[in-house]
Amino acid sequence: MPILERFGAKINSIIGLTISSVLLCIFSSQPFLAARVLDYACSCQPEVSPKGEFRYESKHVRLPKTPAEEITIEEITDWIPQYFPGETFSPETPRQDRELRLFHISHAFLQAAWINRRDCDFHLEISPNEKKDSFRIIVEMTKEYCSERKELQTQMAAKGFILDEKLREFEQPLPVEVVGLAFQDNAGPRGSSKVNSLWEIHPAIVKIVSPRELQKIK
């Protein structure tokens, strides 16, 4: 075999082995990456103790098994704060009045999401329509809802969205429905600049719905 042919065959062999090695590394790492993603849903460890969290006991409750009241995001943003508007209230304040009621938002769009490692809650920003400049409220899924969080995070990953400690925007907002308890948070930085209400749905269960299902809801 001529020297150039032998040299070319050797180069092709090296390139083939290199590509195979790279592909092997990529595919072998995928289960690990998937495990890390799903681990946030069920095995996230809070960085702050419950005593260091604002109204921790009030946030981390189970949803009541009662019929939910239908509500819209527009109606929620019209709610008046029930705890000293504009002032700080006790971090031990128990749930009362509206915060004891279960609500259902049948029409909303998931605009942004991140994980708060302080308490491991999923922070989700939803709007009444899919416009990126639309006003939003915050919805939080607590670690008590492991399976629901895992399902949501898996659906996000399937659409190429990475859910972690960084607040990220969805290029194409996702249609969702929400059921959960009303909750008034304290004033302060809580998400993007488009969030304009102290009222949240927290805890909540959030489900991605198909555009066809959303049309039926309308």
Model-derived regions: residue spans:
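Residues at the start of alpha-helices and the adjacent loop-to-helix junctions
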Residues: 13, 26-27, 99, 172
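N-terminal secretory signal peptides that target proteins for export/translocation
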Residues: 1-11
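OB-fold and OB-like single-stranded nucleic-acid-recognition modules
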Residues: 35-218
